[in-house]
Protein backbone atom coordinates (compact mmCIF):
# COMPACT_ATOMS: atom_id res chain seq x y z
CA UNK A 1 0.00 0.00 0.00
CA UNK A 2 1.35 3.41 -0.90
CA UNK A 3 0.63 6.99 0.00
CA UNK A 4 1.20 10.12 -2.06
CA UNK A 5 3.51 12.76 -0.64
CA UNK A 6 4.23 16.12 -2.15
CA UNK A 7 7.92 16.73 -2.67
CA UNK A 8 8.36 20.45 -3.29
CA UNK A 9 11.68 20.88 -5.01
CA UNK A 10 10.92 24.04 -6.97
CA UNK A 11 7.87 25.88 -8.29
CA UNK A 12 7.55 27.32 -11.80
CA UNK A 13 9.08 30.79 -11.45
CA UNK A 14 6.79 32.39 -14.08
CA UNK A 15 9.63 34.70 -14.99
CA UNK A 16 13.32 35.14 -14.27
CA UNK A 17 15.40 32.74 -16.33
CA UNK A 18 12.13 31.48 -17.75
CA UNK A 19 12.13 34.41 -20.18
CA UNK A 20 15.52 33.24 -21.45
CA UNK A 21 13.97 29.82 -21.98
CA UNK A 22 11.20 31.54 -23.97
CA UNK A 23 13.84 33.34 -26.04
CA UNK A 24 15.66 30.08 -26.69
CA UNK A 25 12.45 28.31 -27.72
CA UNK A 26 11.60 31.31 -29.92
CA UNK A 27 14.88 30.86 -31.81
CA UNK A 28 14.34 27.09 -32.00
CA UNK A 29 10.97 27.57 -33.71
CA UNK A 30 12.59 29.98 -36.19
CA UNK A 31 15.35 27.52 -37.05
CA UNK A 32 13.00 24.52 -37.29
CA UNK A 33 9.42 25.38 -38.24
CA UNK A 34 10.09 28.61 -40.17
CA UNK A 35 12.94 27.05 -42.13
CA UNK A 36 10.75 24.01 -42.89
CA UNK A 37 8.03 26.28 -44.28
CA UNK A 38 10.54 28.08 -46.48
CA UNK A 39 11.63 24.82 -48.09
CA UNK A 40 8.51 25.10 -50.28
CA UNK A 41 10.09 28.14 -51.96
CA UNK A 42 12.69 25.78 -53.45
CA UNK A 43 10.05 23.60 -55.13
CA UNK A 44 9.88 25.46 -58.44
CA UNK A 45 13.67 25.33 -58.65
CA UNK A 46 13.72 21.62 -57.85
CA UNK A 47 11.04 20.90 -60.46
CA UNK A 48 12.97 22.80 -63.12
CA UNK A 49 16.40 21.38 -62.27
CA UNK A 50 15.39 17.73 -61.77
CA UNK A 51 12.46 17.75 -64.27
CA UNK A 52 9.99 16.24 -61.78
CA UNK A 53 6.29 16.84 -61.09
CA UNK A 54 4.52 18.21 -58.00
CA UNK A 55 4.02 14.89 -56.22
CA UNK A 56 7.69 13.87 -56.48
CA UNK A 57 9.00 17.24 -55.33
CA UNK A 58 6.53 17.48 -52.45
CA UNK A 59 8.12 14.45 -50.81
CA UNK A 60 11.03 16.61 -49.64
CA UNK A 61 8.84 18.81 -47.48
CA UNK A 62 6.84 15.79 -46.36
CA UNK A 63 9.91 13.86 -45.22
CA UNK A 64 11.27 16.85 -43.26
CA UNK A 65 7.95 17.35 -41.48
CA UNK A 66 7.46 13.62 -40.98
CA UNK A 67 10.90 13.05 -39.47
CA UNK A 68 10.53 16.10 -37.22
CA UNK A 69 7.32 14.72 -35.77
CA UNK A 70 8.05 10.99 -36.08
CA UNK A 71 11.24 11.30 -34.04
CA UNK A 72 9.75 13.71 -31.49
CA UNK A 73 9.56 10.94 -28.83
CA UNK A 74 13.24 10.28 -29.51
CA UNK A 75 13.93 13.94 -28.77
CA UNK A 76 12.04 13.61 -25.48
CA UNK A 77 14.01 10.48 -24.55
CA UNK A 78 17.36 12.12 -25.32
CA UNK A 79 16.48 15.24 -23.31
CA UNK A 80 15.23 13.14 -20.37
CA UNK A 81 18.21 10.77 -20.34
CA UNK A 82 20.97 13.28 -21.10
CA UNK A 83 19.77 16.88 -20.91
CA UNK A 84 17.73 19.31 -22.95
CA UNK A 85 20.90 21.25 -23.69
CA UNK A 86 22.75 18.25 -25.11
CA UNK A 87 19.76 17.12 -27.17
CA UNK A 88 19.22 20.50 -28.85
CA UNK A 89 22.93 20.97 -29.59
CA UNK A 90 23.14 17.52 -31.17
CA UNK A 91 20.02 18.26 -33.20
CA UNK A 92 21.50 21.52 -34.47
CA UNK A 93 24.59 19.71 -35.74
CA UNK A 94 22.53 17.07 -37.54
CA UNK A 95 20.18 19.61 -39.14
CA UNK A 96 23.05 21.75 -40.38
CA UNK A 97 24.78 18.70 -41.84
CA UNK A 98 21.60 17.80 -43.73
CA UNK A 99 21.37 21.22 -45.38
CA UNK A 100 25.04 21.26 -46.31
CA UNK A 101 24.88 17.77 -47.84
CA UNK A 102 21.68 18.73 -49.66
CA UNK A 103 23.46 21.58 -51.41
CA UNK A 104 25.60 18.96 -53.21
CA UNK A 105 22.64 16.74 -54.23
CA UNK A 106 22.51 15.43 -57.79
CA UNK A 107 19.02 13.88 -57.60
CA UNK A 108 15.82 14.11 -55.62
CA UNK A 109 16.75 10.90 -53.79
CA UNK A 110 19.81 12.63 -52.38
CA UNK A 111 17.57 15.46 -51.15
CA UNK A 112 15.18 12.94 -49.62
CA UNK A 113 18.02 11.54 -47.48
CA UNK A 114 19.95 14.70 -46.64
CA UNK A 115 17.45 17.55 -46.57
CA UNK A 116 14.61 15.20 -45.61
CA UNK A 117 15.76 12.49 -43.21
CA UNK A 118 18.90 13.97 -41.65
CA UNK A 119 17.59 17.52 -41.25
CA UNK A 120 14.23 16.26 -39.98
CA UNK A 121 15.96 14.10 -37.37
CA UNK A 122 17.97 17.10 -36.19
CA UNK A 123 14.85 19.24 -35.92
CA UNK A 124 13.13 16.48 -33.91
CA UNK A 125 15.86 16.52 -31.27
CA UNK A 126 15.35 20.27 -30.85
CA UNK A 127 11.66 21.02 -31.21
CA UNK A 128 9.64 19.11 -28.58
CA UNK A 129 12.25 19.39 -25.76
CA UNK A 130 12.43 23.17 -26.20
CA UNK A 131 8.63 23.50 -26.10
CA UNK A 132 8.35 21.26 -23.04
CA UNK A 133 10.98 23.34 -21.22
CA UNK A 134 8.77 26.44 -21.48
CA UNK A 135 5.94 24.59 -19.74
CA UNK A 136 8.24 23.72 -16.84
CA UNK A 137 9.16 27.36 -16.23
CA UNK A 138 5.65 28.83 -16.47
CA UNK A 139 2.30 28.09 -14.87
CA UNK A 140 0.19 31.23 -14.40
CA UNK A 141 1.36 32.85 -17.65
CA UNK A 142 1.86 29.63 -19.58
CA UNK A 143 -0.29 30.54 -22.61
CA UNK A 144 1.42 33.92 -23.03
CA UNK A 145 4.87 32.33 -22.75
CA UNK A 146 3.96 29.73 -25.35
CA UNK A 147 2.49 32.44 -27.57
CA UNK A 148 5.76 34.35 -27.58
CA UNK A 149 7.87 31.22 -28.03
CA UNK A 150 5.76 29.80 -30.86
CA UNK A 151 5.63 33.16 -32.64
CA UNK A 152 9.15 32.42 -33.83
CA UNK A 153 7.59 30.31 -36.56
CA UNK A 154 5.67 33.29 -37.94
CA UNK A 155 8.44 35.86 -37.49
CA UNK A 156 10.93 33.50 -39.08
CA UNK A 157 8.63 32.86 -42.03
CA UNK A 158 8.09 36.59 -42.54
CA UNK A 159 11.82 37.32 -42.55
CA UNK A 160 13.15 34.19 -44.22
CA UNK A 161 10.65 33.85 -47.09
CA UNK A 162 11.87 36.90 -49.07
CA UNK A 163 15.45 36.30 -47.93
CA UNK A 164 15.42 32.72 -49.22
CA UNK A 165 13.93 33.89 -52.54
CA UNK A 166 16.70 36.48 -52.81
CA UNK A 167 19.37 33.90 -51.94
CA UNK A 168 18.07 31.58 -54.66
CA UNK A 169 18.22 34.38 -57.23
CA UNK A 170 21.72 35.44 -56.19
CA UNK A 171 23.42 32.12 -55.36
CA UNK A 172 21.13 29.47 -56.93
CA UNK A 173 19.32 26.87 -54.85
CA UNK A 174 22.59 25.16 -53.93
CA UNK A 175 24.07 28.30 -52.42
CA UNK A 176 20.83 29.05 -50.59
CA UNK A 177 20.81 25.59 -48.98
CA UNK A 178 24.44 26.01 -47.94
CA UNK A 179 23.69 29.35 -46.26
CA UNK A 180 20.66 27.89 -44.48
CA UNK A 181 22.92 25.11 -43.22
CA UNK A 182 25.05 27.69 -41.48
CA UNK A 183 21.97 29.49 -40.18
CA UNK A 184 20.48 26.46 -38.40
CA UNK A 185 23.73 26.00 -36.48
CA UNK A 186 22.27 28.67 -34.21
CA UNK A 187 20.32 25.80 -32.66
CA UNK A 188 23.49 24.97 -30.74
CA UNK A 189 23.37 28.43 -29.17
CA UNK A 190 19.70 27.94 -28.31
CA UNK A 191 20.52 24.68 -26.56
CA UNK A 192 23.00 26.43 -24.29
CA UNK A 193 20.16 28.56 -22.87
CA UNK A 194 18.07 25.58 -21.72
CA UNK A 195 18.99 25.48 -18.04
CA UNK A 196 17.20 22.52 -16.40
CA UNK A 197 14.72 22.98 -13.55
CA UNK A 198 13.29 20.47 -11.08
CA UNK A 199 9.59 20.86 -10.42
CA UNK A 200 7.53 19.70 -7.47
CA UNK A 201 5.73 16.50 -8.30
CA UNK A 202 3.73 13.70 -6.76
CA UNK A 203 5.75 10.68 -5.84
CA UNK A 204 4.52 7.34 -4.60
CA UNK A 205 6.36 6.52 -1.36
CA UNK A 206 5.76 3.09 0.20
CA UNK A 207 4.71 3.05 3.80
CA UNK A 208 7.33 0.42 4.51
CA UNK A 209 10.45 1.95 3.05
CA UNK A 210 12.67 -0.79 4.47
CA UNK A 211 11.15 -3.29 2.02
CA UNK A 212 12.23 -1.24 -0.98
CA UNK A 213 15.66 -0.63 0.50
CA UNK A 214 16.14 -4.33 1.14
CA UNK A 215 15.14 -5.10 -2.47
CA UNK A 216 17.67 -2.58 -3.73
CA UNK A 217 20.40 -4.11 -1.58
CA UNK A 218 19.54 -7.58 -2.86
CA UNK A 219 19.79 -6.34 -6.44
CA UNK A 220 23.15 -4.73 -5.76
CA UNK A 221 24.59 -7.82 -4.13
CA UNK A 222 23.30 -10.21 -6.76
CA UNK A 223 25.40 -11.35 -9.68
CA UNK A 224 24.94 -9.38 -12.92
CA UNK A 225 23.82 -12.59 -14.64
CA UNK A 226 21.46 -13.84 -11.93
CA UNK A 227 17.67 -14.03 -12.43
CA UNK A 228 17.22 -11.54 -9.56
CA UNK A 229 19.22 -8.89 -11.40
CA UNK A 230 17.21 -9.48 -14.57
CA UNK A 231 13.96 -9.21 -12.61
CA UNK A 232 15.06 -5.96 -10.98
CA UNK A 233 16.03 -4.50 -14.34
CA UNK A 234 12.69 -5.43 -15.88
CA UNK A 235 10.81 -4.00 -12.89
CA UNK A 236 12.66 -0.70 -13.10
CA UNK A 237 12.00 -0.50 -16.84
CA UNK A 238 8.27 -1.20 -16.41
CA UNK A 239 7.94 1.35 -13.62
CA UNK A 240 9.80 3.93 -15.67
CA UNK A 241 7.60 3.38 -18.72
CA UNK A 242 4.44 3.42 -16.62
CA UNK A 243 5.43 6.69 -15.00
CA UNK A 244 6.58 8.24 -18.28
CA UNK A 245 3.76 7.14 -20.59
CA UNK A 246 0.84 6.38 -18.28
CA UNK A 247 -1.10 9.22 -19.90
CA UNK A 248 -1.59 7.05 -23.00
CA UNK A 249 -4.43 5.29 -21.16
CA UNK A 250 -6.31 8.53 -20.48
CA UNK A 251 -9.47 8.82 -22.57
CA UNK A 252 -9.08 12.58 -23.01
CA UNK A 253 -5.59 12.13 -24.41
CA UNK A 254 -6.72 9.37 -26.79
CA UNK A 255 -9.43 11.64 -28.23
CA UNK A 256 -6.94 14.49 -28.56
CA UNK A 257 -4.55 12.14 -30.37
CA UNK A 258 -7.17 11.07 -32.91
CA UNK A 259 -8.15 14.67 -33.51
CA UNK A 260 -4.52 15.66 -34.05
CA UNK A 261 -4.23 13.16 -36.90
CA UNK A 262 -6.93 14.94 -38.93
CA UNK A 263 -5.74 18.41 -37.96
CA UNK A 264 -2.17 17.61 -39.01
CA UNK A 265 -3.36 16.25 -42.35
CA UNK A 266 -5.13 19.50 -43.13
CA UNK A 267 -2.62 22.07 -41.95
CA UNK A 268 0.51 20.92 -43.80
CA UNK A 269 -0.30 21.19 -47.56
CA UNK A 270 -0.98 24.94 -47.53
CA UNK A 271 2.63 25.75 -46.69
CA UNK A 272 3.70 23.53 -49.57
CA UNK A 273 1.24 24.70 -52.22
CA UNK A 274 0.39 28.31 -51.40
CA UNK A 275 3.26 29.66 -53.51
CA UNK A 276 2.69 27.24 -56.46
CA UNK A 277 -1.06 27.95 -56.31
CA UNK A 278 -0.47 31.69 -56.37
CA UNK A 279 1.86 31.30 -59.35
CA UNK A 280 -0.73 29.17 -61.16
CA UNK A 281 -3.36 31.94 -60.95
CA UNK A 282 -1.01 34.60 -62.34
CA UNK A 283 0.64 36.05 -59.23
CA UNK A 284 4.30 37.02 -59.64
CA UNK A 285 7.13 35.23 -57.84
CA UNK A 286 7.78 38.10 -55.43
CA UNK A 287 4.09 38.51 -54.64
CA UNK A 288 3.76 34.77 -54.03
CA UNK A 289 6.72 34.86 -51.63
CA UNK A 290 5.16 37.93 -50.00
CA UNK A 291 2.02 35.89 -49.29
CA UNK A 292 4.16 33.55 -47.21
CA UNK A 293 5.59 36.57 -45.41
CA UNK A 294 2.09 37.87 -44.65
CA UNK A 295 1.14 34.43 -43.41
CA UNK A 296 4.13 34.52 -41.10
CA UNK A 297 3.45 38.00 -39.71
CA UNK A 298 -0.20 37.33 -38.92
CA UNK A 299 0.85 33.99 -37.48
CA UNK A 300 2.84 36.01 -34.94
CA UNK A 301 -0.21 38.08 -34.04
CA UNK A 302 -2.23 34.91 -33.56
CA UNK A 303 0.48 33.36 -31.37
CA UNK A 304 0.81 36.30 -29.01
CA UNK A 305 -2.75 37.66 -28.87
CA UNK A 306 -4.40 34.25 -28.46
CA UNK A 307 -1.85 33.34 -25.81
CA UNK A 308 -2.52 36.59 -23.96
CA UNK A 309 -6.30 36.37 -24.32
CA UNK A 310 -6.54 32.78 -23.08
CA UNK A 311 -4.51 33.73 -20.00
CA UNK A 312 -7.24 36.20 -19.02
CA UNK A 313 -9.52 35.11 -16.21
CA UNK A 314 -12.63 35.16 -18.42
CA UNK A 315 -11.13 32.74 -20.99
CA UNK A 316 -8.69 30.71 -18.93
CA UNK A 317 -11.22 27.92 -18.42
CA UNK A 318 -12.16 27.91 -22.12
CA UNK A 319 -8.77 27.28 -23.75
CA UNK A 320 -10.07 23.97 -25.08
CA UNK A 321 -12.98 25.73 -26.81
CA UNK A 322 -10.65 28.40 -28.22
CA UNK A 323 -8.49 25.65 -29.70
CA UNK A 324 -11.51 24.05 -31.40
CA UNK A 325 -12.64 27.43 -32.70
CA UNK A 326 -9.25 28.19 -34.28
CA UNK A 327 -8.92 24.79 -35.98
CA UNK A 328 -12.45 24.98 -37.42
CA UNK A 329 -11.92 28.47 -38.86
CA UNK A 330 -8.71 27.38 -40.57
CA UNK A 331 -10.72 24.59 -42.17
CA UNK A 332 -13.30 27.11 -43.42
CA UNK A 333 -10.49 29.20 -44.92
CA UNK A 334 -9.39 26.16 -46.91
CA UNK A 335 -12.90 25.76 -48.33
CA UNK A 336 -12.87 29.35 -49.58
CA UNK A 337 -9.37 29.26 -51.09
CA UNK A 338 -10.28 27.85 -54.56
CA UNK A 339 -12.48 30.92 -55.15
CA UNK A 340 -9.60 33.34 -54.45
CA UNK A 341 -7.57 33.77 -57.63
CA UNK A 342 -6.05 37.25 -57.43
CA UNK A 343 -3.37 38.74 -55.22
CA UNK A 344 -5.76 41.23 -53.48
CA UNK A 345 -8.01 38.31 -52.50
CA UNK A 346 -5.17 36.03 -51.41
CA UNK A 347 -3.84 38.66 -48.99
CA UNK A 348 -6.87 38.55 -46.63
CA UNK A 349 -6.84 34.76 -46.90
CA UNK A 350 -3.22 34.68 -45.74
CA UNK A 351 -4.11 37.02 -42.87
CA UNK A 352 -7.07 34.94 -41.68
CA UNK A 353 -5.44 31.55 -42.06
CA UNK A 354 -2.20 32.76 -40.52
CA UNK A 355 -3.94 34.24 -37.48
CA UNK A 356 -5.86 31.12 -36.53
CA UNK A 357 -2.93 28.87 -37.42
CA UNK A 358 -0.85 30.77 -34.89
CA UNK A 359 -3.72 30.56 -32.41
CA UNK A 360 -4.15 26.78 -32.33
CA UNK A 361 -0.42 26.06 -32.60
CA UNK A 362 0.05 28.08 -29.41
CA UNK A 363 -2.70 26.18 -27.62
CA UNK A 364 -1.55 22.65 -28.53
CA UNK A 365 1.01 22.41 -25.67
CA UNK A 366 -1.33 24.30 -23.31
CA UNK A 367 -4.24 21.91 -23.93
CA UNK A 368 -1.88 18.93 -23.67
CA UNK A 369 -0.55 20.20 -20.34
CA UNK A 370 -4.09 20.56 -18.99
CA UNK A 371 -4.79 16.93 -19.86
CA UNK A 372 -1.57 15.18 -18.71
CA UNK A 373 0.00 17.66 -16.28
CA UNK A 374 3.41 19.31 -16.27
CA UNK A 375 5.39 16.27 -15.11
CA UNK A 376 4.56 14.21 -18.22
CA UNK A 377 4.43 17.17 -20.61
CA UNK A 378 7.70 16.42 -22.39
CA UNK A 379 6.72 12.82 -23.17
CA UNK A 380 3.14 13.78 -24.05
CA UNK A 381 4.28 16.46 -26.47
CA UNK A 382 6.62 13.93 -28.01
CA UNK A 383 3.64 11.65 -28.67
CA UNK A 384 1.45 14.51 -29.92
CA UNK A 385 4.07 15.67 -32.40
CA UNK A 386 4.79 12.05 -33.29
CA UNK A 387 1.16 11.78 -34.40
CA UNK A 388 1.78 14.64 -36.83
CA UNK A 389 4.31 12.48 -38.66
CA UNK A 390 2.18 10.29 -40.91
CA UNK A 391 -0.25 13.08 -41.92
CA UNK A 392 2.68 15.38 -42.64
CA UNK A 393 4.25 12.63 -44.73
CA UNK A 394 1.25 11.69 -46.85
CA UNK A 395 -0.82 14.89 -47.13
CA UNK A 396 1.44 16.93 -49.48
CA UNK A 397 1.98 14.01 -51.91
CA UNK A 398 -1.75 13.22 -51.86
CA UNK A 399 -2.51 16.87 -52.55
CA UNK A 400 0.08 16.85 -55.34
CA UNK A 401 -1.45 13.72 -56.83
CA UNK A 402 -4.88 15.39 -56.77
CA UNK A 403 -3.42 18.46 -58.50
CA UNK A 404 -1.76 16.32 -61.18
CA UNK A 405 -4.91 14.22 -61.67
CA UNK A 406 -7.57 16.93 -61.67
CA UNK A 407 -5.49 19.75 -63.10
CA UNK A 408 -6.54 22.14 -60.30
CA UNK A 409 -6.02 22.70 -56.58
CA UNK A 410 -9.72 22.61 -55.65
CA UNK A 411 -9.97 18.95 -54.60
CA UNK A 412 -6.74 19.13 -52.59
CA UNK A 413 -7.82 22.23 -50.65
CA UNK A 414 -11.34 20.94 -50.00
CA UNK A 415 -10.01 17.67 -48.60
CA UNK A 416 -7.70 19.54 -46.23
CA UNK A 417 -10.49 21.86 -45.13
CA UNK A 418 -12.90 19.05 -44.30
CA UNK A 419 -10.16 17.21 -42.38
CA UNK A 420 -9.58 20.20 -40.10
CA UNK A 421 -13.29 20.80 -39.57
CA UNK A 422 -13.80 17.13 -38.67
CA UNK A 423 -10.92 17.38 -36.18
CA UNK A 424 -12.66 20.25 -34.43
CA UNK A 425 -16.09 18.61 -34.49
CA UNK A 426 -14.70 15.37 -33.04
CA UNK A 427 -13.15 17.09 -30.03
CA UNK A 428 -16.21 19.26 -29.51
CA UNK A 429 -18.63 16.34 -29.69
CA UNK A 430 -16.67 14.29 -27.15
CA UNK A 431 -16.41 17.26 -24.79
CA UNK A 432 -20.18 17.87 -25.01
CA UNK A 433 -20.94 14.20 -24.29
CA UNK A 434 -18.67 14.21 -21.25
CA UNK A 435 -20.22 17.46 -20.02
CA UNK A 436 -23.71 15.96 -20.32
CA UNK A 437 -22.65 12.91 -18.32
CA UNK A 438 -21.20 15.08 -15.59
CA UNK A 439 -24.44 17.02 -15.23
CA UNK A 440 -26.39 13.84 -14.44
CA UNK A 441 -26.29 14.08 -10.64
CA UNK A 442 -26.67 10.69 -8.92
CA UNK A 443 -29.26 10.47 -6.14
CA UNK A 444 -29.22 7.73 -3.48
CA UNK A 445 -32.27 5.47 -3.53
CA UNK A 446 -33.36 2.70 -1.23
CA UNK A 447 -33.12 -0.73 -2.78
CA UNK A 448 -36.02 -1.90 -0.60
CA UNK A 449 -38.48 0.58 -2.12
CA UNK A 450 -39.17 -0.40 -5.76
CA UNK A 451 -41.63 2.46 -6.15
CA UNK A 452 -39.01 5.14 -5.67
CA UNK A 453 -37.76 6.26 -9.08
CA UNK A 454 -35.80 9.41 -9.74
CA UNK A 455 -35.33 11.27 -12.98
CA UNK A 456 -32.82 14.08 -13.34
CA UNK A 457 -32.03 16.70 -15.94
CA UNK A 458 -28.80 17.63 -14.22
CA UNK A 459 -30.22 20.13 -11.75
CA UNK A 460 -33.75 19.13 -10.61
CA UNK A 461 -34.89 15.69 -9.47
CA UNK A 462 -38.49 14.65 -9.82
CA UNK A 463 -40.05 11.88 -7.76
CA UNK A 464 -43.25 9.99 -8.37
CA UNK A 465 -43.02 8.01 -5.15
CA UNK A 466 -45.83 9.94 -3.46
CA UNK A 467 -48.12 9.63 -6.48
CA UNK A 468 -47.52 5.87 -6.52
CA UNK A 469 -48.18 5.62 -2.80
CA UNK A 470 -51.39 7.60 -3.11
CA UNK A 471 -52.78 5.00 -5.49
CA UNK A 472 -52.36 2.26 -2.88
CA UNK A 473 -53.36 4.22 0.19
CA UNK A 474 -56.08 6.64 1.21
CA UNK A 475 -55.82 10.23 0.04
CA UNK A 476 -53.20 12.02 2.03
CA UNK A 477 -53.46 15.56 3.32
CA UNK A 478 -51.88 18.23 1.20
CA UNK A 479 -48.12 17.69 1.40
CA UNK A 480 -45.83 20.41 2.49
CA UNK A 481 -43.39 21.65 -0.10
CA UNK A 482 -39.92 20.23 0.31
CA UNK A 483 -41.01 17.20 2.39
CA UNK A 484 -38.53 14.41 2.87
CA UNK A 485 -39.22 11.46 0.59
CA UNK A 486 -37.29 9.06 2.75
Swiss-Prot record:
Xref: InterPro entries: MFS, MFS_dom, MFS_trans_sf, Proton-linked_MCT
Quaternary organization: Interacts with isoform 2 of BSG; this interaction is required for its localization to the plasma membrane.
TM region(s), chain numbering: 10-30, 58-78, 86-106, 115-135, 148-168, 177-197, 253-273, 289-309, 320-340, 353-373, 383-403, 410-430
Membrane topology, from the record: Multi-pass membrane protein
Its biological purpose: Functions as a transporter for creatine and as well for its precursor guanidinoacetate. Transport of creatine and GAA is independent of resting membrane potential and extracellular Na(+), Cl(-), or pH. Contributes to the process of creatine biosynthesis and distribution.
Gene behind the chain: Slc16a12
GO cellular component: basolateral plasma membrane; plasma membrane
Gene Ontology BP, a term: creatinine metabolic process
Record-given protein name: Monocarboxylate transporter 12
Catalytic activity, as annotated: creatine(in) = creatine(out); guanidinoacetate(in) = guanidinoacetate(out)
One Pfam short name: MFS_1
Regulation of this protein's activity per its record: Creatine uptake is inhibited by carbonyl cyanide 3-chlorophenylhydrazone (CCCP) and by valinomycin.
MF term (GO), any: creatine transmembrane transporter activity
Tissue expression as described in the entry: Highly expressed in the lung, liver, kidney, and pancreas. Expressed in eye lens.
Signal peptide: none
Sequence ranges on the Cytoplasmic membrane side: 1-9, 431-486
Entry keyword set: Cell membrane, Membrane, Transmembrane, Transmembrane helix
Protein's cellular compartments: Cell membrane; Basolateral cell membrane
Family affiliation: Belongs to the major facilitator superfamily. Monocarboxylate porter (TC 2.A.1.13) family.
Residue ranges of coiled coil: none
